Amino acid sequence: MTSNLAGNTNTAQDSDRPMIQMLSPEGKRVRSGEYDSYAADLTGEDMMEFYRDMVLIRRVDAEGNALQRQGQLGLWAPLKGQEAAQIGLGRALREQDFVFPTYREHGLAWCRGVEPETLLGMFRGQHHGGWDPQENRFHTYTIVIGSQVLHATGYAMGVKFDGDVATGDLDRDTISVACMGDGATSQGDVSEGLNFAAVFHAPVLFFIQNNQFAISEPNSAQMAAPLFKRGTGFGVPGVRVDGNDVLAMYSVAKASADSIRAGLGPMLIEAFTYRMGAHTTADDPTKYRSDALTESWLEKDPIDRVRRFLHHEDYADQKFFDEIDEEADALAARIRAACMAMEPPAPSEMFDSVFVEKHPLIEAEQREYLEYLDSFAEEGAL
């Protein structure tokens, strides 16, 4: 059977439940029943902001990719194609919510106030994170596949124990978000997180960006059932959303977050999307997927979809689009200059953030390491 989005045979995505879509690839509004009310208050200006977010973060992504190819970054994990999934979710969250990302959540980082330059610094090796997770309510990037799901679940359990959910106070009730890709769902950590979340009724949203490939493995080689059903056996209800539709992502994420915030337990969203670029800059996607498949997804580009909608509804004129392009150019120049100006960190800094408080053993190791470095200077002086 052929998926209505992927354009390729993929039995893992066959389902008797339709995918939630609110904007067609042509930019036309699609009614979605239960989720329409969550989009009712959105204005043309809101849709223009969605467009701006996606254009700017795509430009950040392009610069990150280019900087790595030029030897300025050690690695980069491209986001292109997944902007709607991340921006839609990011703009649906509240300030107190806590996001636990993987290494590709540049759009969510943007929504949580993490500066693009800071992301570049991490991939440049200038620091190990560079932002305060508590300030941004956004954990540092997680490289170990699936481990962040346990962190998000544990955090949500703590939120419940502290009484910060189901109080009726929208500025207090808190959820956590466990981000992952389709490949991560094969990790045992994800199953453990789902089980603990369900058993302890933890306020956590499991957010799966199904971009069709776990590095080089297609969905058909990973799973025999659609991912939105993955939580069912654990007691975690799920929904599948057109991940290239920012309006659907926003509405479903807001509905799910409201339900979790009200104390109704964890939920799961599968954002059905496509990674247009490589898994990372260490990868060559032409080795495992066809150009025809990628071309079919270009027709569903998340940014073009919103642009068509804004045109169709007369919300934006050419001047608006030109101004966004100019802003993207300025952003690209800014972050490129910032990246090129970054100085290597002092070697001793790796000891500074091991523990919250100073620890005598760490301090001793730092002293020994500094003495070791000084010995080279002494030898050079001789």
Question: What is each residue range found by the language model?
Answer:
Residues M1-A84, G277, T286, D291-L382:
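Conserved acidic/glycine
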Residues R17-P18, S37, A62, Q70-G71, ...:
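Residue-level signal for pocket-adjacent positions within structured domains
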Residues R59-A62, A66-A202, P218-F228, G233-G235:
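Cofactor-binding active-site loop characterized by glycine-rich and histidine/acidic residues
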Residues Y103, A271-T273, V354:
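A general secondary-structure junction signal
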Residues G146-P344:
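Glycine-rich ThDP/TPP pyrophosphate-binding loop and its adjacent helix/strand module
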